[in-house]
């Protein structure tokens, strides 16, 4: 594995130097099963789980026997709130539950590295100096810049939390999703056709990810002892 080099694009259509993408993050073997598990857990955690239905004992009414037991020629009934009646209770209906799944940090980190590596291998990661020049947000400028970078539809823009100008510039673009570097995740990377990093966001992400990798290696060595 060797580090990847990418040009840094500027808003005027030129390039300004290059950056290196560490092979330990952007050139690893992707595990489809692992990424699927992590994405499934992430989507499950977004579910509210507040669905609820009432059984026959919870539905209002139905305490009185609708008609006498014998002599009517009809089938005997004990309550008009039985499940087979309109307005009756639900049998085995959904109840509130927690859909979240436990996913270890190492699995999340490995899945994210695999997703980024896949995008890097297909030349779908881009690095920019700044999305919009100056301090005034401009949706038009942001859209033009992104269209020059890629013709694909779904774009994930990774920024620093302080870059409010860029975040406001892409807020109204329907197929562009902006995300702080510390919230980068497997689902958003895989959902996007292209991933665009600002230089500052890329540096922050690599620094955090490299620190996590060193901690994992240290823990592995200690466990081996």
Swiss-Prot record:
Family matches, as SUPFAM superfamilies: Ribosomal protein L4
Biased composition (Basic residues): 62-73
GO CC field: ribonucleoprotein complex; ribosome
GO molecular function: rRNA binding; structural constituent of ribosome
Region described as Disordered: 46-102
Function: One of the primary rRNA binding proteins, this protein initially binds near the 5'-end of the 23S rRNA. It is important during the early stages of 50S assembly. It makes multiple contacts with different domains of the 23S rRNA in the assembled 50S subunit and ribosome.
PANTHER family, A to Z: 50S RIBOSOMAL PROTEIN L4 (PTHR10746), LARGE RIBOSOMAL SUBUNIT PROTEIN UL4M (PTHR10746:SF6)
Family label: Belongs to the universal ribosomal protein uL4 family.
Name listed for the protein in its UniProt record: Large ribosomal subunit protein uL4
Taxonomy of the source species: Bacteria, Bacillati, Actinomycetota, Actinomycetes, Mycobacteriales
């Amino acid at each position: 594995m060797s580090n990847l080099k990418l040009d840094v694009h500027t808003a005027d259509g030129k390039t300004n130097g290059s950056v290196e993408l560490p092979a330990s993050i952007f050139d690893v073997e992707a595990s489809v099963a692992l990424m699927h598990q992590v994405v499934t857990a992430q989507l499950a955690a977004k579910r509210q789980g507040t669905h609820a239905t009432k059984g026959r004992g919870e539905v209002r009414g139905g305490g009185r026997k609708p008609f006498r037991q014998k002599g009517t020629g009809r089938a005997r009934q004990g309550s008009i709130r039985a499940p087979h009646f309109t307005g009756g209770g639900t049998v085995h209906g959904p109840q509130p539950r927690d859909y979240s799944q436990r996913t270890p940090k190492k699995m999340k980190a490995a899945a994210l590295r695999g997703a980024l590596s896949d995008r890097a291998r297909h030349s779908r990661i881009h690095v920019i100096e700044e999305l919009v020049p100056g301090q005034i947000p401009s949706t038009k400028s942001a859209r033009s810049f992104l269209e020059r970078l890629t013709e694909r539809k779904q774009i994930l823009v990774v920024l620093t939390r302080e870059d409010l100008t860029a975040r406001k510039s892409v807020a109204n673009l329907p197929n562009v999703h902006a995300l702080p570097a510390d919230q980068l995740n497997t689902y958003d990377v895989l959902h996007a056709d292209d991933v665009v990093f600002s230089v500052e966001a890329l540096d922050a992400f690599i620094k955090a990810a490299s620190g996590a990798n060193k901690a994992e290696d240290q823990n592995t060595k200690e466990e081996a002892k």
